[in-house]
Structure formats: structure tokens, C-alpha cells
């Protein structure tokens, strides 16, 4: 049902999926099922600390709904002001209710209740970016873009550790899909309604997705204002004024409605000292966060983004790299004022990074006729490298598990989190 709703969102955004797109999505999902099953079956992992939070919440949600529907709904809505809301438990109950209720079962269930919808939205995003860039070789572009983004290690990292936070990316990708080429020339009720609902849902999924929301809408507003300035300079002042009017009207109405809808969460945020409460998790500020981002990207993805920026400069298409870059900078600066990111919080940066990834895959696809075999070989190598990255609470660098086992690397950031984990366990 969720996937069908996402396909409808893609249609509203003008990014419909054809048979080839759906076949690739299904193939990726099938590989993910095998990957999750094999990885979870071949490891030993104790679900404690943050890695048990949602499992325990799922138990509590089941117990509440077992009493009555009213008690269950009260449990869900009673967490609106909490850092961990119970919103996600509504969507992860099936097929978890059919399992042995272990931590591994909870992690594996996400392949069925979250991943299909996430992949459909990601596919729509890949198609939409290709449309904006006017990519001519759509087949190779979609194949490269869809596989390289879906295989990115830190997309699945938190899910493998029992944290279903990638659920929020469903709505993050929906926001991008619905807004990237929308310029508010007129207010489309269905589109703006979906944008509002996706924004509310991503905030409900996890509080820290607000950093993505603020960063993205700030960058998006700047992009629209820059477009209006160009229109005005070109003699189309009336069209520019219409865009500004519609943007302001939608923005004000959305903010008021969002504050009313999420008032328990908003009032808690305004009254709570997050910087003081989470200063314990601030291990090095912006410098450490920059190290995390470089390590989590990996050399090949960094090269892919550089290739994409060169492609955008060559084709004079600055809107997407500027949108993604501005969103990332604002989100990173805001987040590091409070703490540094763990693997699950890194998810809030993936929409921006994936736009940059897709710029790179567009460059690869456009030049596929030159050194085709070399490029296909590099693509296959990067996929295998991405799929072999160890999913661990202490994973700082995106490198395969067998490399870590044979060539252990001592990293100050990793040592910090080891100390943090032991200290938290001792406190408990």
C-alpha cells in the first residue's frame, strides 16, 4: 500500500516509473532480503543502549494495543514530545508480529515494512533528477544512480543495528521529489498538501530530521528567490511576484499548521536545553564531524561527487548542486552546535548527498560510450565494496569488514565512542 502511494506521489511530481525502473527496484529489494538474512544470521550482536530502544517500544506498543485500541493510540500520541516518538512502531508492527520478537527479527522485518516504500521513493528521486539534468542515456543513468545510492552503507547501517530511523527518509525523498522542480507559479492543492504531510511525517519520525527540514527549506527558498530575481531582471516582474506570493502564502500557512499540529513537540523543543543535555555526545564539534563525513563517504563516492560537480559546471546546471550543498552546510552547522552524528543521525544528510551522487552518475551515463568496460568494472567494484562494509556501532570509515579484521585502524573518534559506550553501560 505504501509503495502504491509513493508511485502516486511520483506521478504528481511527473516522475513515473516504467517497467524497467520497477524491475531494477524489485531486483535491489530481492538482493537486500538475501543480504539482511545472511548478515543477521552470521553475526552476534547484543541489542543494548540505543540499539534496543525501538525494540522495547515495539513491545510496549503491542502491549498497549492488546489492552484496547484507545490505549494503543494514547501510547502513540503520548510520545509526541519525546526524543523517541512511537510513530514508527505503527509501521513496523507487521510483519514483526509474526516473528519470534528478537532483535534480529526486528531488524529483518524492516526489509518488508520500510525498504520497499523507501526504494520506490528513491527511484522516483533518481528519475526526477535525470529529468532536471536532461540526461540522454536514461537506462545507464538509472541503473548507476539507483544501485549506487541503494547500496550506500550508511543507508542501511542503522537498520542493521535495530534502529528503523531510515523510515524518515521515505518522507525526505518525497519532499525532494515534490519540490526540486516546483517553482510556485501556481498553488497545486494536491502537491502542496503532500509536501505538508511529508514534512509533518518526517518530523514525527525522528526529532533530529528537523535539521534536514530547516536546511533544505532554507536552501529551497534561496533557490526560488534567486529564480524570481532572474525573472524580474528579464522583464517578467508579474511572474516573479506571483511566485513570491505563493511561496510566502504556503510557507506561513504551513508553519502555523505545523505548530498547531505538533505543539507538544514544539513546546518541548523551545523549553529544553538540547545543547546542554547532549553536550556529552559532542566529541569534537565541526572538525570531528567533517572527519566523519569524509570517512563515511569513502574515496569513490567523493570522486563521484566531484565528477558530478564538474558535470553540472560543464552543462551550466548550478541549481541542484547549490541546493544540495546549501542544505548540507546549514544542516551540519546546526547539528554540530548540539552534538556529533552517530550512524543513525547521519541519515538526515543523505538526501543532499544523494543528489550529488546522482550528478556523478549522470556524468558516468552520458559518457558511457567512452571506456565502457572500465566504467562498468568500476561500478561493479564500488557496489561490491559498498555491500561489504561492516555494519557496526563503531564503524567510522566506509571500508569492508575483512579489511578491519586484518588491518585494524586506531581512530581517535572510534576510541571516543568506545569510551562513550562503556561509560553509558556503567551508568546503567
Listing of model-derived features with the role each one plays in the protein:
Residues 40-52, 65-90, 111-112, 294-295:
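Membrane-proximal lumenal/periplasmic loop motifs of glycosylation machinery
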Residues 82, 86-120, 158:
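Loop-to-helix entry region of an early transmembrane alpha helix in multi-pass inner-membrane enzymes
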Residues 157-167:
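Short acidic/glycine- and proline-prone juxtamembrane loop motifs at membrane-interface regions
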Residues 247-255, 364-400:
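Signature aromatic-anchored transmembrane alpha helix within multi-pass, membrane-resident enzymes
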